[in-house]
A protein has these predicted regions:
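A conserved acidic beta->alpha catalytic loop
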Residues: 22, 45-54, 70, 100
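Glycine-rich, basic loop-to-helix element that forms the pyrophosphate-binding segment
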Residues: 68-85
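Short, flexible, basic/aromatic active-site loop/helix in glycosyltransferases
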Residues: 139-178
Length: 291
């Protein structure tokens, strides 16, 4: 088996079919390299209640639906999907991604020609065609203050921390190795997964991709951005309205990441955790007030 696709769904009925149809069309399209892919697809459903699984089973019967029995989080669902498949390459995918023609074959060709590439990722576009800055530098202590969505980044868009983190001094139009890429769409080599281990299930959602890519890089596998392959990401469509749990889990993931990769003195760890969760509580409060 050349390729296994693992799609994790949660309340994804409105977008999953566009994702799967673009996937199916892209894989069955003619590959200029003349190398057809033997492939399989599993949809790991995290207890959707909106008819996601029924739509997939009716409209895309070639995809195997696995019901996880609860909302396990992204990392745990991905790991179960990887364990249930056998492809040499594993495409981890959000259900709100729609592939451009030729993109999947371009990623597979990159992996064939770069034997030490552990993860290859496409250029991810927003629905309006602009680039989603999905290839980034490792986060540091200032990242949670100056990340893509923070108020400080909006007030000071050209700040040096955002430029470093989002790699804004690079045009994102040429291939290169990077620190990490978004888990919304990433093609991983099973041999690399076997070497470094699966995603860390201590991350419920968010930051598991940063950690996985970091472990790949540290083990000598490259993480490569391949802009020839492109996908449109209808970001947030698989999450629905942002819940307080999503906000809290994102910030808990930040704390786990920093404790795992940036351990300092206990007082500094506690201070960093306090500041991160204070930000989370502020966002929860704003979420409740509808702001």
């Amino acid at each position: 088996m050349d390729l296994s696709v693992v799609v994790v769904t949660y309340q994804s009925r409105d977008h999953i079919l566009a994702c799967l149809r673009s996937l199916d069309a892209g894989i069955h399209a003619h590959d200029p390299a003349g190398a057809p892919l033997a492939w399989e697809c599993v949809v790991m459903d995290n207890d959707s209640r909106d008819g996601t699984t029924e739509v997939v089973e009716r409209e895309a019967p070639w995809a195997r639906v696995i019901r996880t029995g609860g909302n396990l989080g992204y990392a745990k669902a991905v790991n179960r999907g990887i364990a249930a498949t056998r492809g040499v390459l594993v495409l981890v995918l959000n259900p709100d991604c729609v592939w451009h023609p030729g993109a999947i074959h371009a990623l597979a060709a990159w992996m064939r020609s770069h034997e030490r590439c552990g993860i290859a990722a496409p250029r991810i576009l927003n629905p309006d065609g602009s680039v989603e800055y999905s290839a980034r530098a490792y986060p540091d202590s200032f990242t949670f203050l100056f990340n893509r969505y923070s108020l400080l980044s909006r007030l000071w868009p050209g700040n040096p921390w955002s430029r470093r983190y989002l790699l804004l001094d690079w045009d994102h139009a040429s291939p290169r190795s990077v620190d990490w890429v978004s888990g919304a769409a990433m093609l991983a080599r099973r041999g690399a997964i076997d070497a470094v281990g699966p995603m860390d299930e201590a991350f419920f959602m968010f930051n598991e991709d940063v950690d996985w890519c970091r472990r790949m890089n540290e083990a000598g596998w490259s993480v490569d951005y391949v802009p020839e392959a492109a996908v449109v990401h209808h970001i947030g469509a698989s999450k629905g309205v942002v819940s307080n749990r999503v906000i809290l889990e994102r910030h808990r993931g930040m704390i786990h990441y920093f404790r795992k990769h940036h351990r300092r003195s206990a007082p500094l760890d506690r201070l960093a955790a306090f500041l991160i969760m204070a930000r989370a509580r502020m966002l929860v409060l704003l979420n409740r007030t509808g702001r």
